[in-house]
């Protein structure tokens, strides 16, 4: 660039070219040679240089750069000037796009200068600027009208409406009845026990046992059990096509009383003729003995039957393969029965007997009897439709809301947090089997709830309606209306002078649910024509068509009857789906209502704000349109439309100048001047001077000016931060955190969903599930154990009394001898009984504690006696004569002689030799007897026949041997002599 001066003869047009080519037509100020006038551009630049010297550079540049800046300014002021003539005709400008032109009408701005290379002062000014470190900057060309927009007119806002028809009422919910039909039944049978016992020499064992149950005949039930409270001891039963007979205790048939059983379960009663069974054992060993026990048993038990009621089970474990509703009446004959007709019997007007009180029933009943191969069962017959029902009441709902939505009914029950869905058509109770109880129970429950809660506030608006909900729940619903609403309906009728049915008016859905369809016309409705002479052909055709229609209808009806089957309603075991449906409907209703209201409010707010936008666009169209389009645009109002152009993002650097003062000392920029480059890595020749706009928008012109004011303070957004100017001079950067924020947003306050707890509900309780089967196995087990304890205790069965058997045998023996033998037998048995009683008394005494002490004393006494006996035996062995005949001793003889007056010296001459010989013979005989007894004992121990024979022979020899001694005299000679 030359250092000469160019005279300012006027303003010229041109383009300033940088390295990037043609950029934009803009104004360039030329330097002047003379001293700057007031407000001239050079004066402005000098003022900027002074401010630059007075204010420390924010980037911390060294002092050498400041000195260079001063030198450069002096050269500009005092350098030589070269004056050139400036052509009066401006040079033609470089062509630019129409949309980028400054003025759309094509006029030239006289303040713009031709393109030239920047002088050092301009470079210094740019270098002293503040670089934007972050943030996005945009440059917006002025709109020319090639693109125009308009504001949308107001919209029609939607109105909140659920679109449902709500009806309140009372309901009763029914479920499938899985519980069996229960009734009382009597079981009659005779328990036969045949025992076979082996009798050995010293033991008895049970070798076989036969047990069987045989039914009691119906005649015996009539004649003995229910008439006298007794039962026969005889049993007749058929086994293997052979009629067998059994008698209790193998005796003749007798009538035994039925006594209550001591063992009975809470749900059953029993009576029997005996509590024990005995076994007969004869007196002869090495034989088998057979005995029979017959026990007549009557049990009152619980019977159960489940759908389709073709059999029932007893708590004894027996199953009867016949329906409990089978009978001889017309309606009962179609029920199931697997037994022959002769095994079944039905008695009208029967009065059973209570075996405890021995009283007959006052009211007669219809009694059924079935004889099976093992038992006879009786029960009171009842009608099936009266007692059996396939549905049972589950819940009584005192507050239910029904709404119609998308062709279905939704029954909402807040008390159990459940929603049931059904069709809009009513359910016919006739299509399900055994549902006669539903209508009765539903009516009673609904009437009871109405009288307690709603009689004074509501009125019924229809009859009871039945709907089959999903999951197998039958809902009996009766709609209601409040008294106020019903009064409004009545007033409407009076006002309009109408005579409609009040029920149809209060419940408009009733007509839709009656399932009434228009009857289709057919040939059946046309009477059969009678032939006439005028229209014979036509009447013949009608006759044939009528006949075909009758045949087709008959065939269709018969097929429908055979194909029509009643379907049993199956109910799910859980209502979790209904609870989830209730939760979903509750959330859906709340959310939909909330969103609908938000949409309505939003639309209303937008319509109101549209008026504000329409007025604000006249003040600042660029800001309004940019906020509306959510995009940076430049806008200008063209009448009733708005012209817009899109802004381009600046990719290069943006420098902010320190001073906002212009060349005129009285005029300043209202927004900071900047220098920027369009592209990255552009040199100084590609820089453009502009002005900082709002929200980081860069103007390519510096038109925003104002009169300079004192104490001026401004904050401008530059990038992501703010810059602070005071007296039109840059002071510092201000972070956004130091500036307090004022929010212009309106908070949206929404109501949250209310909390709702799900209650655990059981459709079937545990007791109901346990009670669903035919057999109660716990009851069966208890009954079988108690039955075994009652009748089959092995301790009472094998209880053989040998004494009683012997006594019975002796009595039978004497009884066979006639009356004399029977009398003798009575005497003998009485004595034997006394002996047995004595022995039993002794045995009981020994079992007593005092008896043990007595036994101890007896043992001690026996030991003492044994000691004295042992001493006596030893004395006999040592001196048998002295021990056996102590009178033969010498002392006794001397004493006798002394008493008769004799001397001791005469002993030898006067001793009686005959008596001595007799004594010797007696001792010898006693020795032989002792030896004979020993021999006999040895023979008995050895059980040898030879020894026994020898012993008997010895006894005979001793008996036949004559005595060796003479009879003693009655009077002693010595006594006679003494007396003389």
UniProtKB/Swiss-Prot annotation:
A proteolytic cleavage by host furin generates two subunits that remain linked by disulfide bonds. Its main location: virion. It is found in: Virion membrane; Host cell membrane; Host endosome membrane; Host Golgi apparatus membrane. This is Envelope glycoprotein B. Residues 87-849 are virion surface. It is a single-pass type I membrane protein. Residues 871-980 are intravirion. InterPro entries: Glycoprot_B_PH1, Glycoprot_B_PH2, Glycoprot_B_PH2_sf, Glycoprotein_B_ecto_C, Herpes_Glycoprot_B. Residues 88-118, 505-535 are annotated as: Disordered. One of its GO terms (cellular component) is virion membrane. Residues 197-203, 282-290 are annotated as: Involved in fusion and/or binding to host membrane. Residues 1-86 form the signal peptide. Homotrimer; disulfide-linked. Binds to heparan sulfate proteoglycans. Interacts with gH/gL heterodimer. Disulfide bonds join 140-647, 157-603, 231-296, 389-437, 668-708. Residues 794-847, 823-843 are annotated as: Hydrophobic membrane proximal region.
